[in-house]
């Protein structure tokens, strides 16, 4: 049986969007930092398009936050 990893992308995107706004970074600046089109970045924040995991990791890195994976017990 194949394991599938799912994530609550909407909650994560809300947190990343709030962090960007708190740090007073524009969508354009953050999109440029992570190497994606500003329009696409805006679609991610509006939850019109789901970013790939790689893009989420780049987004986290640009905001200097950690992306961790755990199971329900807090272990992996």
Model-identified regions with their sequence ranges:
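A short, Lys/Arg-rich alpha-helix, primarily the initiator
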Residues: 1-22
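Short alpha-helical DNA-recognition segment
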Residues: 24-43
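Residues that mark the N-terminal boundary/hinge immediately upstream of a DNA-recognition element
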Residues: 15, 26, 52-55
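Alpha-helical residues within the helix-turn-helix
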Residues: 21, 32, 61
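DNA major-groove recognition helix of helix-turn-helix/homeodomain DNA-binding modules
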Residues: 52-69
């Amino acid at each position: 049986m194949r394991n599938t990893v799912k994530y609550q992308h909407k909650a994560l995107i809300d947190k990343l969007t709030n962090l960007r706004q708190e740090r007073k970074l524009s969508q354009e600046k953050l999109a440029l930092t992570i190497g994606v089109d500003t329009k696409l970045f805006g679609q991610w924040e509006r939850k019109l398009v789901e970013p790939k995991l790689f893009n989420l990791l780049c987004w986290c890195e640009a905001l200097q936050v950690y992306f961790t994976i755990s199971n329900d017990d807090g272990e992996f």
